[in-house]
Curated annotation (Swiss-Prot):
Its cofactor is Mg(2+); Mn(2+). Keywords: Lipid biosynthesis, Lipid metabolism, Magnesium, Manganese, Membrane, Metal-binding, Phospholipid biosynthesis, Phospholipid metabolism, Transferase, Transmembrane, Transmembrane helix. This is Choline/ethanolaminephosphotransferase 1. Mg(2+) 2 binds at D95, D116, D120. It comes from Arabidopsis thaliana. The record marks E113 as: Increases basicity of active site His. CDP-choline binds at N48, R103. Pfam families: CDP-OH_P_transf.
């Protein structure tokens, strides 16, 4: 099955990336550092290799979290927190300089954008697992993934319509990641138990505030992120898309329909957890976040590809391929309600099947699209030289 049609191949040759970053932290602090840091890499180093190396830092971080806190509810050694912070900082740095390396080597391409943003989509899951071990979030780790996935999906959706990736003054890739790796370093000093305290104990400034002072610190951070980061960002995305759709006399309902695969994915997993007799997310947080994160990566990848290739036809239907496993999982969990709490198939095996399904689907998509784009543009994924005509 091919993912790119003849029209898409022609569109790839015309495509030009457009992005704007309004972050003051990036402009005055990080950009000068990144401009110098990119010179560490030799000119023969392909940008996609830098992207992949950065992504592997987060994979390593999540593995450390799993080894020392399998259910993300026990404190790992303090050096693990420091490692989480360092690996996230390196991921952010490598993710920022891959584009600079592409411009240095005159090797910018639509494949680079897809590869970069595709890794970023998966990074939401792997960093959520790493932070879950730092803050001992347990089942709340899934919600920390959700609050990173929603703005990412919203930004991708906005980019699809505006043709420009707009990062506001305070954004996730810059200030958000910086705040998280600082949190990792901070935890290496005070210990993971700090996050398990009530907010009034961990931050005495809030001790006088009724109700708020009794909330667990990690959960209070989750609520604050939703209120002050996720909701404003989503409102920003919707406003920008509405302006574009209105200027084109288009349908906002059809634009919003592109969000439903993600809503169904999120809702399906939550219903599965509700029906499951084993408290699914709390028992196997890594597997739930991994499987759902890969399904999310497929959704984002399909939307980015449709944008690059100007091929929106059938987009929503194709995106729903990542949802095909959920009806089976829900039906199996429902059998437990009808059979004295015992499902037809053990939930662990169903969850492992979910991860295998999403891994297979994503790998098929990624490898197929990389092959199709490299053939269409006459380039290599991990080499700077062009293919001979």
């Amino acid at each position: 099955m091919g993912y790119i049609g003849a029209h898409g191949v022609a569109a790839l040759h015309r495509y030009k990336y457009s992005g704007v970053d309004h972050s003051y932290l990036a402009k005055y602090v990080l950009q000068p550092f990144w401009t110098r840091f990119v010179k560490v890499f030799p000119l023969w180093m392909p940008p996609n290799m830098i992207t992949l190396m950065g992504f592997m830092f987060l994979v390593t971080s999540s593995l450390l979290g799993y080894i020392y806190s399998p259910q993300l509810d026990s404190p790992p050694p303090r050096w693990v927190h420091f490692a989480h912070g360092l690996l996230l900082f390196l991921y952010q740095t490598f993710d920022a300089v891959d584009g600079k390396q592409a411009r240095r080597t005159n090797s910018s391409s639509p494949l680079g954008e897809l590869f970069d943003h595709g890794c970023d989509a998966l990074a939401c899951a792997f960093e959520a697992m790493a932070f879950g071990s730092t803050a001992m979030c347990g089942r709340d780790t899934f919600w920390f993934w959700v609050i990173s996935a929603i703005p990412f999906y919203g930004a991708t959706w906005e980019h699809y319509f505006t043709n420009t990736l707009i990062l506001p003054v305070i954004n996730g890739p810059t200030e958000g990641l910086a705040l998280i790796f600082v949190s990792h370093f901070f935890t290496a000093i005070v210990g993971a138990e700090w996050w398990a305290q009530q907010l009034g104990q961990s931050i005495p400034l809030f001790s006088w505030v009724p109700f708020v002072n009794e909330i667990q610190t990690s959960r209070a951070v989750l609520y604050m992120m939703i209120a002050f980061a996720v909701i404003p960002t989503v409102a920003f995305n919707v406003t920008n898309v509405y302006k574009v759709v209105r200027s084109r006399n288009g349908s906002m309902v059809l634009a919003l329909a592109m969000l439903y695969p993600f809503v169904v994915l999120l809702g399906g997993v939550l219903i599965w957890d509700y029906l499951s007799p084993i408290n699914l997310i709390a028992t196997y947080p890594h597997l739930v976040v991994l499987g759902t994160g890969l399904a999310f990566g497929f959704l984002v990848g399909r939307m980015i590809l449709a944008h690059l290739c100007d091929e929106p036809k059938g987009l929503k239907t194709n995106m729903c391929m990542s949802l095909l496993y959920l009806p089976f999982a829900l039906a199996n969990a429902l059998t437990a309600r009808l059979n004295a709490g015992v499902p037809l198939v053990d939930e662990l095996w169903v969850l492992l099947g979910y991860c295998i399904f999403t891994v297979s689907l994503y790998l098929h998509f990624a490898t197929s699209v990389i092959h199709e784009i490299t053939e269409a543009l006459g380039i290599y994924c991990f080499r700077i030289t062009r293919k001979e005509a």
